Swiss-Prot record:
This protein's record includes keyword Nucleotidyltransferase: yes
EC assignment: 2.7.7.4
Species annotation: Brucella anthropi (strain ATCC 49188 / DSM 6882 / CCUG 24695 / JCM 21032 / LMG 3331 / NBRC 15819 / NCTC 12168 / Alc 37) (Ochrobactrum anthropi)
PANTHER family on file: SULFATE ADENYLYLTRANSFERASE SUBUNIT 2 (PTHR43196:SF1)
Pfam family, one: PAPS_reduct
Highest taxon listed in the record's lineage: Bacteria
Gene of this entry: cysD
Summary of the function given for this chain in its UniProt record: With CysN forms the ATP sulfurylase (ATPS) that catalyzes the adenylation of sulfate producing adenosine 5'-phosphosulfate (APS) and diphosphate, the first enzymatic step in sulfur assimilation pathway. APS synthesis involves the formation of a high-energy phosphoric-sulfuric acid anhydride bond driven by GTP hydrolysis by CysN coupled to ATP hydrolysis by CysD.
Family per record: Belongs to the PAPS reductase family. CysD subfamily.
Keywords of the record: ATP-binding, Nucleotide-binding, Nucleotidyltransferase, Transferase
Protein name (Swiss-Prot/TrEMBL): Sulfate adenylyltransferase subunit 2
Keyword Nucleotide-binding: yes
InterPro entries: PAPS_reduct_dom, Rossmann-like_a/b/a_fold, SO4_adenylTrfase_ssu, Sulfate_adenylyltrnsfr_sub2
Top EC group: transferase
Pathway membership, UniProt: Sulfur metabolism; hydrogen sulfide biosynthesis; sulfite from sulfate: step 1/3
Upper taxonomic lineage: Bacteria, Pseudomonadati, Pseudomonadota, Alphaproteobacteria, Hyphomicrobiales
């Protein structure tokens, strides 16, 4: 039967789902030691759901790695542990202990150094420690300009570096999975999804997500044009700052001092989808790490970031 006739009756989300499942299976068949990066955000939750579907009724044939910067929202960590318990997947948590010993944090060292040491270096440490040859990530092309030119199979050097000029063509959904000794790939099954696709799929499949994505009254302080939630007592107020209880939610999740909330009353999934339909800003506008300097995401990716 002709391929087109097999796919013409699929909905937009079914096509995206089928593509992602195909990518998961391709990697599982081609690599000896894959891992899925589990950051606990909405994209990770969709990836987890797709991975469970791809290999059902067997569990996914790879562990899930969480790079813990020690500054994640507490609700994210609670959700991560609950999901691992409920779904029964193998969860690996890696913290850059050198960074902890040196006291690296977003307040003391700034977002640039904190992200490099506690995320990028920590990720490289974990990939080296477990000798993973392929790592799934939840990055999407619509998020940010350096990710827009990223391949689905992103080849990395033995030092985990990304050279955008040295990537392979991906015609007709045919992927070249060959790597030399020491090299690895980062794989992005959600490359062609948009933020709206993600939310519509979460709604359709009823995928559990961290409650921080839903609007609630939360203690926030306005700092550098962002609404930062006070998640623990490590965040000290600057002169003139006041804590306000505002109705907010998060479009994107990361380290709490670097993640801005948005004022919103979207309290359930259908509210969020409705809000996304009229949104005119990128979700990563709420990420301080992407504002460090022009082209900063590409710079981080070249150093080994996702």
């Amino acid at each position: 039967m002709h391929h087109a006739s097999l796919t013409k009756n699929l909905t937009h989300l079914q096509r995206l789902e089928a593509e992602a499942i195909h990518i998961f299976r391709e990697v599982a068949a081609s690599f000896s030691n894959p891992v899925m990066l589990y950051s606990v955000g909405k994209d990770s939750s969709v990836m987890l759901h797709l991975a469970m579907k791809a290999f059902y009724p067997a569990p996914p044939p790879f562990p899930f790695l969480h790079v813990d910067t020690t500054w994640k929202f507490r609700e994210m960590i609670e959700f991560r542990d609950a999901q691992a318990r409920e779904k029964g997947f193998e969860l690996l948590v890696h913290i850059n202990e050198d960074g902890v010993r040196e006291g690296v944090g977003p307040f003391s060292h700034g977002s640039n150094v904190h992200t490099h040491v506690m995320k990028t270096v920590a990720l490289r440490q974990a990939l080296d420690k477990y000798k993973f040859d392929a790592a799934f990530g939840g990055a999407r092309r619509d998020e940010e300009k350096s990710r827009a030119k990223e391949r689905i199979f992103s080849f990395r050097s033995a030092q985990h570096g990304w050279d955008p000029k040295n990537q392979r063509p991906e015609m007709w959904k045919i992927y070249n999975t060959r790597v030399s000794a020491g090299e690895s790939i980062r794989v992005f099954p959600l490359s062609n999804w948009t933020e709206l696709d993600i939310w519509q799929y979460i709604l359709q499949e009823n995928i559990p997500i961290v409650p921080l994505y839903f609007a609630a009254h939360r203690p926030v302080v306005e700092r550098d044009g962002m609404l930062i939630m006070l998640d623990d007592d490590r965040m000290k107020l600057r002169p003139g700052e006041t804590v306000e209880n505002r109705l907010v939610r998060f479009r994107t999740l990361g380290c709490y001092p670097l993640t801005g909330a948005i004022e919103s009353s979207a309290a359930d999934l259908s509210d969020i989808v409705e809000e996304m339909l009229i949104a005119r800003t990128s979700e990563r506008q709420g990420r301080a790490i992407d504002r460090d300097e022009a082209g900063s995401m590409e710079k981080k990716k070249r150093e080994g970031y996702f």
